[in-house]
Amino acid sequence: DRSVSRGLGDVYKRQLLFRPLPKHLNQSVIENALDPAKDVDCMTDGSMSGVFTGKNVGFPPCTPQACMEILDHYGIDCTGKKAVVVGRSLVVGKPAAMMLIKKNATVTVCHTRTVDMPSVVKEADIVIVAAGRAGVVDDTYLREGQVVIDVGINVNEEGKLCGDVDFEKAEPIVEAITPVPGGVGSVTTSVFCLLYTSDA
């Protein structure tokens, strides 16, 4: 309810919606009751529109922003590079693609209907994988010289955390790859803390 959002507006400098919500609640209504200027995880339609239009409406989504921070930290210039994002969710895939475009990369988004995905991914200089399936990207997708950012967080058959990229097969081939755990997830937490406390 927007009245709840307005009522909290003067009290709280930042707003974060914890999910999943109870099933009886309408997630879209609740997300859009947040104030875009205080929505630290880009849940509102207004916040997300800022990502797609290039206008600074509220805050960027934390996980795609973490991917950009990793590229920046290691001095990886995206200008003119071919980038592939595996996954088209509104949480990671689509916003990550838009952020890469803003960095002047030439971006392709792969998804479950992509034909010959390994060949498409192999052409990329930068690969962001947010497919939501453990080890879906293996050595057949990759080549030397690539930078791979693995956003996935899964539990394998042994009960261990793993990413969407088969790390053991990928790591010897590519130039650089983020591990799971200890990669994007850790940076996402740092990005969230930075956004949550900025100008608060």
Predicted regions and their residues:
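Anion-binding alpha/beta catalytic cores of soluble intermediary-metabolism enzymes, centered on
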Residues: 14-82
